[in-house]
Amino acid sequence: MSVSTTVKKYGIEQAIKFMYKDPEKNLPKLMDWADTFCKGRFPGQRAAIRRAIEDPTYPYYDFIRHMMNEVDHDVLTTIVVNFFINANMVGCEKQEKLREEHNCNIPWAILLDPTSACNLHCTGCWAAEYGNKLNLTFDEIDDIIRQGKDMGVYMYIYTGGEPLVRKADLIKLCEKHDDCIFLAFTNGTLIDEKFADDMLRVKNFVPAISLEGFEEATDSRRGDGVYGKATHAMNLLRDRKLFYGISSCYTRANFESITSEEYYDSLIRMGAYFIWYFHYMPVGNDASPELLPTPEQRTEVYRRIRRYRSEKPLFAMDFQNDAEFVGGCIAGGRTYLHINANGDVDPCVFIHYSDSNIREKTLLETMKSPLLMAYHDGQPFNDNMLRPCPMLENPEKLRAMVKSSGAHSTDLQSPETVDHLCAKCDRYAAEWKPTADKLWAENRAEHDAK
């Protein structure tokens, strides 16, 4: 880190500490520091944050002040420093230099599975296909993070399996890498008082608790009592003024309820600060393509989430429909990659093919592997940002990349060929295309009119 960067980073950290004393005065000053630090990068994101700080009519104006009041001050300060400064301002500068130097993708975030084990047996879970016997050791995860930080990566996201099966190790990693931010997708059932206290102590761990909707829907897929355990976990987190969110997957069967205003408002009442919506992916030999949303349903999800974002104090992200904000597919190391519990480096958490293993190569070497370079050379996979994925909306692209790179299936329990996977997406892609093209044209017209 250069002396200039260090000085600017210190200035922002001091501004964050003072923001609680007089938010109306100091929050705009904090953004002034950020604008100076960023040197023109992230203009859209900075403009949105500034509006949320300064415009009382904007829904996130009250949201930010709500967070400042309801989230523990030290926790929120740590999250702001580690996420906005380290992972974005400092990290992105280093990533850009490495991208230019090596002519390959360098990720902003690394997703990894500490274990394939899970304490639940959810119907149709693709992660369950891995079995329950695979683990990355503490030292292996620690080394991945060390290599990642050398590349400017300060954002780590745990998937699984159920990551909190390894919660003692995860807390130790938070302690050792206190300059990073850690997010875990979790069923929430293993969050107890001790773990919540540990989260409050380390300050840099954020859970995203998975729900299928309300109690009946969640328990029918995840097991009796799971919804109650998940909401109990939220109570423990809220009592300690911790920052947490929700993750939910929409399908043809549940889209109406899981994207309903009633469900969304219930999460606000539960104290969640964000929700991450995922489109159902037909991954695995036993996956059900009939659960893929219809074009009409996906269009409705697109419109609902954008409306909620403009009106309600709960930040929503739609992994499939928000590609316009990140320039298309972010997998393959362009923004993130996935390392499973066997050490295989997958381009995406939903695409289980690999030609590299972290136990055999350095992280930087995996970025130059044939499969990840095929991603690098092919992105974006479509000019229509509502058709971003090389599997779901452009299955011919994934077929070609997997075959040309010689990548193999990383599903050790029931290996799925790329032809079998993509065949489940062909019809969906063809049916979605005309709707997506029309919707994207409307989107561009609205954008140009502003």
Predicted regions and their residues:
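Radical SAM enzyme [4Fe-4S]-AdoMet core and its adjacent flexible, acidic
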Residues: 1-51, 219-332, 340-342, 346, ...
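Conserved alpha-helical substructure of the radical SAM core
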Residues: 28-194
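Short, charged low-complexity linear segments at domain edges
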Residues: 86-107, 317, 323, 357-373
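Short cysteine clusters
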Residues: 118, 122-125, 329, 343, ...
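A short, flexible beta-alpha/helix-coil linker loop
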Residues: 128-132, 214-217, 282-285
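Radical SAM/AdoMet-radical enzyme domain recognition
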Residues: 138-158, 164-278
